[in-house]
C-alpha cells in the first residue's frame, strides 16, 4: 500500500489511484477562483490574528506569504497541481512551500466547505457587477440608436406578418426595457450573493471564538449567513444567476433573430459591419451574420447550465456533498458566454447601418394601414366591428387586383360612408399612422421621445 500524502490523508492507509484522483480533481476549472481564494484567506487570517486564535506574528507571516502568492498569480507564475485536487489545497500547498509549516494554521476554524462557498460568492459578486456595467453600455447604445431613429418608420409584426407601422426607435426601446429588467434582476441577485459564508466551517460552525462580522466587513459583504448549514449547503444564488442569465440570453437571442432576418436579402433593413460578419468557403457573395447566430445558438448552452445545476441540487441532503463540485463549470461558462454576448450585441448595434428608405418603403406596399382605415370609419360613426368587416373586404379586393388601400378612389370610399373625406389619404400614410398612436407607451413620435427621456434619466441615475 502507498501511504496517502493528501492534506486530509491522516485517516487513510493508502492513496487514490491516479485515474480516480483525476476524476475527483477540480483544479482544471476551479483555478479561476484563485484570486478570490487568496482574498478570502487574507481576511480569515487577519481575523484569526486579531482574535488571538493565532499569534500576530503567525498571522503576519501567513499574510506575507499570501501577498507573495497574489503577486505571483498576477504575474502568471503560479503552477497548480492535479495531485492537490482543488484550488484551496493548491494554494495551501504553495503557501507552505513559501513560509513553511505555519501555513497550516491558516485553516484554523475553517473548512473547505465554507471556503469554496465564500470564493464563489466573491467571484459571482464581482462578475455580476461587471455584467451590469456591460448591460449599461448596451442599454445606452439602444437609447442612442433609438434617438437617431425616432422618425424612421418600419413595419411592426405579429405572426411575422406586417401588422401596423411603428417607429424603429420604438422597436429599439422595447429591447431597452427588456435589458433594464435584466439589470434589475441581476441587482436583486446581487442581494442574495452579497452574503458571507465564511466561518460556517464544515456545517455546524466552530468552537473557536471567531469574528464573522469582521471577515464580512473585510470582504465587503453586506452581512454573514445567519445559519451555518444554509451557508455551505445551498447554491440558490448561482441558480438564481443562471436563471437570470437564461432570461437575458433569451432577450439577446430574440433580438439576434430579428437582426438575422433584417440583414437578409428579403428584408435588407440593416447592413451589419464586416467586423461582425463572415463569408463562405464556397460562395463568394456571402456575408453571414455569424455573431448574431452564435449568440442565438449559445442561448441553449446557458439554458443547459441552469437545468444541469437544478438537477444536481434537486435531491441533495444537507449539508455538503461532493456533487456540489459540479456547480462551478456551468457558472463559469455562463458568466463568460453572457458577458461576451452583451459586448458583441452592443458593438454590433453601434456599427450597423440602418437602411431607413427600405424600412419605410416596405410599409407603403402592404396593408399595415388597414387598422387606420377601420379606426377612421369608427370615428365617423361606423360600429368598429362593421368597420373591421368593411376594411377586411377592401383588403381582399385590393389583394386580387394588385392595389392598396391608399389607391382606392375617394368616390368609392364615400359609397361606404358619406362622412369619409379627402383626409383619408393622409390618415393612410405610414408616418401619420405612427404619429397618431400617441397613447401612453405607444409608438407615436412624441411618446417615443418621452420613453427616451425617461431612459436617459434612468441611465444617469445608475
From Swiss-Prot:
InterPro entries: Arg_succ_lyase_C, Argininosuccinate_lyase, Fumarase/histidase_N, Fumarate_lyase_CS, Fumarate_lyase_fam, Fumarate_lyase_N, L-Aspartase-like. It is found in: Cytoplasm. PROSITE patterns: FUMARATE_LYASES. GO terms for molecular function: argininosuccinate lyase activity. SUPFAM superfamilies: L-aspartase-like. It catalyses: 2-(N(omega)-L-arginino)succinate = fumarate + L-arginine. The keyword Protein biosynthesis does not apply. Keywords: Amino-acid biosynthesis, Arginine biosynthesis, Cytoplasm, Lyase. Pathway: Amino-acid biosynthesis; L-arginine biosynthesis; L-arginine from L-ornithine and carbamoyl phosphate: step 3/3. It comes from the Bacteria. Its EC number is 4.3.2.1. GO terms for biological process: arginine biosynthetic process via ornithine; L-arginine biosynthetic process. GO terms for cellular component: cytosol. It holds the Pfam family Lyase_1. Belongs to the lyase 1 family. Argininosuccinate lyase subfamily. This is Argininosuccinate lyase. It comes from Streptococcus agalactiae serotype V (strain ATCC BAA-611 / 2603 V/R).
Amino acid at each position: 500500500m502507498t501511504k496517502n500524502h493528501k492534506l486530509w490523508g491522516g485517516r487513510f492507509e493508502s492513496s487514490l489511484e491516479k485515474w480516480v484522483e483525476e476524476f475527483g480533481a477540480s483544479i482544471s476549472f476551479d483555478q479561476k477562483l484563485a484570486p478570490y481564494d487568496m482574498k478570502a484567506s487574507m481576511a480569515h487570517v487577519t481575523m484569526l490574528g486579531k482574535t488571538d486564535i493565532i499569534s500576530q506574528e503567525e498571522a503576519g507571516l501567513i499574510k506575507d506569504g499570501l501577498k507573495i502568492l497574489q503577486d505571483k498569480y498576477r504575474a502568471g507564475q503560479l503552477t497548480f497541481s492535479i495531485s492537490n485536487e482543488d484550488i484551496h489545497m493548491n494554494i495551501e500547498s504553495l503557501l507552505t512551500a513559501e513560509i513553511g509549516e505555519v501555513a497550516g494554521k491558516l485553516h484554523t476554524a475553517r473548512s473547505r466547505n465554507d471556503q469554496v462557498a465564500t470564493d464563489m460568492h466573491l467571484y459571482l459578486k464581482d462578475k455580476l457587477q461587471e455584467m451590469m456595467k456591460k448591460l449599461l453600455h448596451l442599454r445606452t447604445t439602444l437609447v442612442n440608436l433609438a434617438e437617431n431613429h425616432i422618425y424612421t418608420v418600419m413595419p411592426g409584426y405579429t405572426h411575422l406578418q406586417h401588422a401596423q407601422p411603428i417607429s424603429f426607435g420604438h422597436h429599439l426601446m422595447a429591447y431597452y426595457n427588456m435589458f433594464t429588467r435584466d439589470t434589475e434582476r441581476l441587482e436583486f441577485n446581487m442581494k442574495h450573493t452579497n452574503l458571507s459564508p465564511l466561518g460556517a466551517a464544515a456545517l455546524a460552525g466552530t468552537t473557536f471564538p471567531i469574528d464573522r462580522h469582521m471577515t464580512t466587513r473585510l470582504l465587503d459583504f453586506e452581512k454573514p449567513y445567519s445559519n451555518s448549514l444554509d451557508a455551505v449547503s445551498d447554491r440558490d444564488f448561482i441558480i438564481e444567476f443562471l436563471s437570470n442569465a437564461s432570461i437575458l440570453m433569451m432577450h439577446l437571442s430574440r433580438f439576434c433573430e430579428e437582426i438575422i432576418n433584417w440583414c437578409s436579402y428579403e428584408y435588407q433593413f440593416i447592413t451589419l459591419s464586416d467586423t461582425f460578419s463572415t463569408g463562405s468557403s464556397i460562395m463568394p457573395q456571402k456575408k453571414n451574420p455569424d455573431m448574431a447566430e452564435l449568440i442565438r445558438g449559445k442561448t441553449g448552452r446557458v439554458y443547459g447550465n441552469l437545468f444541469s445545476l437544478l438537477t444536481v441540487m434537486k435531491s441533495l441532503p444537507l449539508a455538503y456533498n461532493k456533487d456540489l463540485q459540479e456547480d462551478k463549470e456551468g457558472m463559469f461558462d455562463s458568466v463568460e458566454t453572457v458577458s461576451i454576448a452583451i459586448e458583441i450585441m452592443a458593438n454590433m448595434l453601434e456599427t450597423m447601418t440602418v437602411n431607413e428608405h427600405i424600412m419605410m418603403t416596405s410599409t407603403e406596399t402592404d396593408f399595415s394601414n388597414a387598422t387606420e382605415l377601420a379606426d377612421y370609419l369608427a370615428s365617423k360613426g361606423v360600429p368598429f366591428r362593421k368597420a373591421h368587416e368593411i376594411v377586411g373586404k377592401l383588403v381582399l379586393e385590393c389583394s386580387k387586383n394588385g392595389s392598396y388601400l391608399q389607391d382606392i378612389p375617394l368616390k368609392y370610399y364615400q359609397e361606404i360612408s358619406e362622412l369619409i373625406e379627402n383626409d383619408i389619404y393622409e390618415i393612410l400614410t405610414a408616418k401619420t399612422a405612427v404619429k397618431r398612436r400617441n397613447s401612453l407607451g405607444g409608438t407615436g413620435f412624441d411618446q417615443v421621445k418621452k420613453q427616451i427621456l425617461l431612459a436617459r434619466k434612468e441611465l444617469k441615475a445608475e
